[in-house]
């Protein structure tokens, strides 16, 4: 039987390129992850007759993931944008053009229990940026990039989304670990 615990905060978010079913590139850390929210997108319908609802249809058809981080990280932006990233000793430059293809990625997040004894990991194995990539630069405020992704079904191995609750503090990896621990 599952233990009921409370989870607080966001300890880690990672992103990796999606190379195929259950195949991912190297996991990259979203530095200063501030928010990761996941919403199920549900298709619904109902049959009505005799002044009542006779049947209800509901099916999860995708997931929406919103991410916000504390740093402007061009490497992370390059992974999701399909742009061209070049760097030298003086600068990093990410160029996005009309012919760039937005890539599928995998995203995973980690929250710790309020007593520090276990972890909750959330894994969206295949998603693509689906909303605006937001930057707000203004006087007296930090810039916090934010993006919205749409997750699709990857297949039988990982589905659309996984929630894995570990019985001990556990390092976040893509794909998700199957054992507890930080090493």
Can you name each region flagged by the protein language model?
Residues 64-119:
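Structured, beta-strand-rich domain cores
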Residues 1, 6, 11-14, 171-183:
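Membrane-insertive, pore-forming/entry segments and their flanking low-complexity regions
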């Amino acid at each position: 039987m599952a233990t009921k615990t409370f989870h607080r905060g966001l300890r880690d978010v990672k992103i990796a390129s999606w190379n195929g079913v259950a195949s991912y590139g190297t996991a990259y850390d979203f530095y200063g992850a501030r928010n990761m929210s996941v919403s199920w997108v549900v298709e619904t319908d109902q049959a009505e007759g005799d002044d009542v609802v006779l049947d209800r249809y509901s099916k999860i058809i995708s997931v929406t993931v919103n991410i916000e981080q504390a740093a402007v990280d061009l490497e992370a932006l390059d992974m999701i944008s399909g742009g061209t990233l070049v760097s030298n000793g003086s600068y990093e430059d990410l160029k996005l053009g009309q012919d760039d293809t937005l890539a599928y990625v995998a995203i995973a997040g980690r929250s710790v229990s309020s007593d520090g004894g276990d972890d909750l990991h959330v894994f969206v194995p295949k998603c693509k940026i689906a909303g605006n990539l937001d930057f707000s630069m203004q006087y007296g405020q930090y810039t916090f990039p934010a993006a919205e992704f749409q997750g699709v079904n990857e297949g039988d191995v990982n589905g659309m989304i996984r929630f894995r609750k570990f019985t001990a503090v556990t390092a976040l990896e893509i794909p998700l670990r199957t054992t507890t621990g930080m090493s």
